[in-house]
Amino acid sequence: MRRAAVLTAGSWGSVFAKVLADAGARVNLVARDPEIVRAVNTRQVNPRYLPAIQLPDRVRAMSDAGEALAGAEFVVLAVPSQALRSVLAGWAPLIGPDAVYVSLMKGVEVGSQLRMSEVITQVTGVSPDRIAVVSGPNLAPEIAAEQPAATVVASTSTSTAEAVQAACWTPYFRPYTNTDVIGCELGGAIKNVIALAAGMLEGMGFGTNSLASLMTRGLAETLRLGVALGADPMTFAGLAGLGDLVATCGSPLSRNRTFGEKLGRGLTLAQVEAEQQQVAEGVRSCRPLLAMADDLGVAMPITRQVERVLYEGLPPMEAVKDLMSREPGPEYRLRP
């Protein structure tokens, strides 16, 4: 029986623990909250994030990361992207030398501009061949309810990707493999920023044409930056690109879309952050993504306007006007 450790017991981490267990693994779920540990181990429920979902008996919760990581073949990392470096530094000495690292995170680190797999390598020294990235249209509540969904498992090592694929394949969760880690991680990070913009449109009362235009041009930004960084353009037409973008921009279950909707209704960044407890990754990722684009001479006008709304106090309606008043040009332009 496969053994996995999931760190930590947030919404997506808990759901992925369920997926792994339903696929046959024994799963240790790390939770800091003693109440979550008790509830999972006595009632198979995570009362904070998945109160209506019964977790499989093969999922056990614990607060001791060392205990959870002992003997784990797969170490699944599901923490806020900006916290990864600090928490992984403490966990790294506890992880076995042959374990595969599985990243569920969708963000870019502020300051370093590193993708999450790059942070894992930098902190642990592990080879990229032992890291897999899971990315796709994976809204946690729907997967928890066992609604059919697909995802991408990306690794520079085909055998690593296939091992993780086998470990998380269930009747309701279908993983595909890919070797384009750059494209899959960028797709997951940038779609959060575009989803903030999609939420702003919703909050301002705009309709389907506006949303479709935003999503399509947001995908163009993603493609341009991805190509400049060496990603495969086809990745962005797949689950980790278009698929994730559609789910995150279109669903009220999306944290980033919900966050953006509140901004579109007139709330400030500070007000929304005080009101919304769960992390909206696009809020922190937009600046390092813009820095990457600027370094490469890549135009990302939507991302730039989102950054202005978040950090310069630009009214969302003014951001729309600025985007629509830009000089028009050709639709397809991969290179700067």
Curated annotation (Swiss-Prot):
Pathway per its UniProt entry is: Membrane lipid metabolism; glycerophospholipid metabolism
Question: What is one cellular component GO term in this UniProt entry?
Answer: cytosol
User: Per its UniProt record, what InterPro entries does this chain match?
Assistant: 6-PGluconate_DH-like_C_sf, 6PGD_dom2, G3P_DH_NAD-dep, G3P_DH_NAD-dep_C, G3P_DH_NAD-dep_N, NAD(P)-bd_dom_sf
What's the Enzyme Commission number for this chain?
1.1.1.94
Question: Can you say where in the cell this protein is located?
Answer: Cytoplasm
Positions annotated to bind sn-glycerol 3-phosphate: 106, 136, 191, 244, 254-256
* Keyword line: Cytoplasm, Lipid biosynthesis, Lipid metabolism, NAD, NADP, Nucleotide-binding, Oxidoreductase, Phospholipid biosynthesis, Phospholipid metabolism
A single GO molecular function term of this UniProt record: glycerol-3-phosphate dehydrogenase [NAD(P)+] activity
GO BP terms: carbohydrate metabolic process; glycerol-3-phosphate biosynthetic process; glycerol-3-phosphate catabolic process; glycerophospholipid metabolic process; phospholipid biosynthetic process
Q: Does the keyword Cytoplasm apply?
A: yes
* Catalysed reaction, written as an equation: sn-glycerol 3-phosphate + NAD(+) = dihydroxyacetone phosphate + NADH + H(+); sn-glycerol 3-phosphate + NADP(+) = dihydroxyacetone phosphate + NADPH + H(+)
Q: Which SUPFAM superfamilies match?
A: 6-phosphogluconate dehydrogenase C-terminal domain-like, NAD(P)-binding Rossmann-fold domains
Active site (UniProt): 191 (proton acceptor)
Q: Which HAMAP family match?
A: NAD_Glyc3P_dehydrog
Q: What does this protein do?
A: Catalyzes the reduction of the glycolytic intermediate dihydroxyacetone phosphate (DHAP) to sn-glycerol 3-phosphate (G3P), the key precursor for phospholipid synthesis.
Q: Which family does it belong to?
A: Belongs to the NAD-dependent glycerol-3-phosphate dehydrogenase family.
* Name of the featured protein: Glycerol-3-phosphate dehydrogenase [NAD(P)+]
User: What are the leading ranks of the lineage?
Assistant: Bacteria, Bacillati, Actinomycetota, Actinomycetes, Frankiales
Whichever gene encodes this chain, its name is gpsA
